[in-house]
Structures are given as C-alpha cells and as structure tokens.
C-alpha cells in the first residue's frame, strides 16, 4: 500500500530477523488508484524507494512480481531494470520466468574476471603501501572493491567457480 511504501524503512529495519522486503505492486497500484502500464512506469518511484530503504536497513530488496507471463521481452527488460535499481532478486509468478531471473542476476564470466582484476590491483596497491590505484585508466577505490567482492560472492552463491 502507499503507507507501506512510505514506511518501508521502518518495516525493513523492524527486526534483525528481517531478510528482505519487496513491493506488492498490485496492492500498491490499487491503493493509489493507478492503472497498470506495460512498462510499469507508474510504480518506478515506489520500486526505487523500496530498494533504497532495503539497502539502508542492510537487507535484501526483492523486486515485484511481473504478472504478464506472455510478455517475455517485457519481463526481461523489467528484470534488467530491477537489477539496475539495486534489487537483489525478483519474485516470479510462473516457472518460465525463473531462467531469465537466474540469467540476469547471475554474474557473467566477464563481470567475474573484471572483479578479480579489481581485487588483484587493489591488493597489489596495499602491498605497496598505497590505498589508491587504477586499472584500465579507472580509479579503484573502496566502493569498487566492495562491488567486486559482492560480484564474487554472488557468483559463489550461484555455484560458479571464482
């Protein structure tokens, strides 16, 4: 509901046992008297806020259920957007959607190799008593290192060799 979205940080941080939160898109649309659009633009703000508040509370953000099971291209685009918005995963309503979610949320070989390069460059910089380094012309800093570690963690969780 609208109140749930407004209070999403309070909900996300209400208990140490809380693992994830997500948007009930249809409930939200109904409460807000919104018509569902093909691109779900009417719920973009709520999706952003839920993801932001989940991360602020230190828990996972699970993206909403995409209910048009026949629109595979729309679903794929929606999963990509959810990942871009910081979602940790996506709820599904049909078994045919699982493969796309796994494909798009599992790190690619290229992402894994890049993460390894970043961590190696950072470790080399630390060995040389320098906390600052670059790789391929890009500065490597703590947020990049944290992201690289996260990518490798996701890859391990997916059963990939890293």
Q: Where in the sequence are the language-model features?
A:
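Expand to "…catalyze enediolate/carbanion chemistry for C-C bond making/breaking, isomerization
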Residues: 1-162
């Amino acid at each position: 509901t609208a109140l749930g979205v407004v209070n999403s940080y309070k909900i996300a941080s209400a208990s140490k046992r809380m693992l994830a939160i997500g948007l009930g898109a249809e409930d939200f649309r109904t409460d807000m008297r919104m018509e569902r659009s093909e691109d779900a633009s009417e719920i973009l703000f709520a999706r952003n806020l839920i993801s932001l508040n989940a991360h602020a509370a230190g828990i996972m953000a699970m993206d909403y259920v995409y209910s048009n099971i026949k629109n595979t291209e729309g679903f794929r685009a929606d999963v990509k957007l959810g990942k871009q918005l910081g979602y940790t995963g996506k709820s599904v309503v049909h078994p045919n959607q699982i493969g796309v979610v796994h494909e798009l949320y599992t790190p690619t070989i290229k992402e894994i190799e890049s993460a390894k390069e970043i961590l190696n460059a950072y470790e080399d910089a630390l060995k040389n008593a320098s906390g600052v380094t670059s790789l391929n012309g890009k500065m490597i800093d703590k947020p990049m290192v944290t992201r690289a570690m996260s990518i490798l963690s996701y890859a391990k969780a997916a059963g990939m060799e890293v």
